[in-house]
Amino acid sequence: MIKKIFKKTAIFLLMILSGTSCITEDTFNDSPDGNFEALWKIIDEHYCFLEYKNQEYGLDWNKIHSDYKKRLTSSMSNEQLFDVLSEMLNELRDGHVNLVSKDRTSQYREWYDNYPRNFDDSIQSRYLGKDYNTASGLKYQILEDNIAYVYCGSFQSGIGSGNLDQILSKLAICNGLILDVRNNGGGNLTTAEKLAERFTNEKKLIGYMSYKTGPGHNEFSTPEAVYLEPPMDRVRWQKHTVVLTNRRSYSATNDFVNRMKQLDRVTVIGDKTGGGSGLPFSSELPNGCCLLYTSPSPRDRSLSR
């Protein structure tokens, strides 16, 4: 259940808090050892998935500390230190954890590089044709069997309510709808929510969210319910919907898929989404590098992580 929920639930706490929060850390000296200890402690006290990952694949953050500390030398260059710290962060297997220097950014990519792409641009182009419609970044077409096809490649830009009304009204003659979010790397959670709410006629419980309240791996606040509410004065889709996903459906798209899975008349087909959960926080290391990581913890409707 934990694995399923971690993949299904996305970063929907960002609906409540936008932007990036910053954590003030204890003072460490600007040396390989000081930067190492600062980074390790930040993750140990603030990253929300350590206990989950210990249960999921045996991650032992204390052992990680011992193993990687052995690789430090007092004379190592900043580049060498960056490599060691990046490899240590990759043990978390989280694409939302990044180390950023003035000229480099670390990122865990195995969550999609090690799996089939499950997306063919040429096939998609054949479905869309040359005369497809577009509005607010959504590409849509009516297929020969009277099925609507909508491709949403990003949630970076906003989707206008009027544009959604226009799209859904035009597609109302169709027998069903295919909503393709493969290769959608995420973006604005408000945009993802705005699209999802057009597929329900009633307020739906989506899941729960809790916050880190202390340095312990299991110190969280009481879970708070998260709901999806439809705009009753807007056009809403009333027929069956299939949502297509792959490993590159990530971040805000992961949240979108989680919302859609809770709705009636919606079926999700495809590979597991890439994940990407929690509220992004940032901390600065003594050498000026910025550590980006996640803090809150999403839970499903049964209160399981």
Mark where each language-model region is.
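Short, well-structured beta-strand/strand-turn elements
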Residues: 250, 264-276
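Single conserved hydrophobic/aromatic residue that forms the stacking wall/gate
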Residues: 293-304
